[in-house]
Curated annotation (Swiss-Prot):
Main function: Involved in DNA repair and RecF pathway recombination.
Disulfide pattern: none
HAMAP family: RecO (MF_00201)
The UniProt record lists the keyword Translocase: no
Name assigned to this protein: DNA repair protein RecO
Keyword terms: DNA damage, DNA recombination, DNA repair
Organism: Saccharopolyspora erythraea (strain ATCC 11635 / DSM 40517 / JCM 4748 / NBRC 13426 / NCIMB 8594 / NRRL 2338)
SUPFAM superfamilies, sorted: ArfGap/RecO-like zinc finger (SSF57863), Nucleic acid-binding proteins (SSF50249)
GO biological process, one term: double-strand break repair
InterPro entries: ARFGAP/RecO, DNA_rep/recomb_RecO_N, NA-bd_OB-fold, RecO, RecO_C
Highest taxon listed in the record's lineage: Bacteria
Length: 273
């Protein structure tokens, strides 16, 4: 059996038998890994709370036939301690973990950029220096960029004509010019697409200057764009405390075609039964 060590973020936990858990990790060098933490549900477990969702850990594992096994854990950052007592930050962090879990689909495939995005978002949420909705939206935009789904913001998604453009269409891929604008496109306020650009590129001065209505509208566009590409909504995203936004009708139609279902009560940061 070969031993290996890496830093990781705990994405999800699942009961296994009477005392064990399967821990889903996003590691720095090996991508997503599912491993068993033996005896972790016992009060005498040496792992304690170090393998709970939101934990950033240094972990040693040995390779098993089906699942790897966790042998040592050391806490690097206890992000959860600064997140779980704030509902908005907690639900935002749940959305971060669920997004990562969905995008890192293949186990054992390195996804360093996604790992850095996840740890950066959790660190920002735990630090409480920035608005949690802005942190989440910045993460979602950058995660979509990692996946190759970033919305066009400064040029037309169809003809590449330079903007600014007044319309946005998720099926087309983002901002669209007047000539290419499909039916059903939305017309966000003039400040909304610049806000999304600022979040994507880390211009926090511009992002934090945005008004509340602009932030809410931007959140709606980001969520709709993400849902279109993932083909079903994140379970945790409806729980994030933000004003309601209307899902474009084309998204509803796509969901109906796929027979998509959503469970707004379930949380990726909880323990699967």
């Amino acid at each position: 059996m070969s031993l290996y060590r890496d830093s990781a973020v705990v994405l999800r936990v699942q009961k296994l038998g009477e005392a064990d858990r399967i821990i889903t990790l996003l590691t720095r060098r090996y991508g997503k890994v599912r491993a068993v933490a033996k005896g972790v549900r016992r009060t005498t477990s040496r792992f304690g709370a170090r393998v709970e969702p939101f934990c950033h850990i240094d972990v040693q594992l040995y390779t098993g036939r089906t699942l790897d096994v966790i042998t040592q854990v050391q806490t690097l950052d206890a992000f959860g301690a600064h997140i779980v007592d704030d509902y908005q930050r907690y639900t935002s962090a749940c959305a971060v973990l669920e997004t990562v879990d969905r995008l890192a689909a293949e186990e054992g495939e390195p996804v360093l950029r996604l790992y850095l995005l996840a740890t950066g978002a959790l660190r920002a949420l735990a630090g409480r220096e920035r608005d949690s909705s802005l942190v989440l939206d910045a993460f979602l935009l950058r995660a979509m960029s990692f996946a190759g789904w970033a919305p066009a913001l400064d040029e037309c998604a169809r003809c590449n004509a330079r903007g600014p453009h007044a319309a946005f269409n998720v099926a087309a891929g983002g901002a669209v010019c007047a000539e290419c604008r499909p039916a059903g496109s939305v017309r966000p306020s003039a400040a909304t697409l610049p806000l999304l650009e600022a979040l994507l590129h880390g211009d926090w001065a511009v992002a934090e200057a945005a008004t509340t209505p602009v932030r809410r509208e931007g959140s709606g566009l980001i969520a709709a764009h993400l849902q279109w590409h993932m083909e079903r909504q994140l379970r945790s995203l409806p729980l994030v405390e933000r004003s309601e936004w209307k899902v474009p009708e084309i998204i509803r139609e796509r969901a109906a075609e796929l027979g998509a279902t959503q469970d707004p009560v379930a949380s990726p940061a909880g323990e699967d039964g």
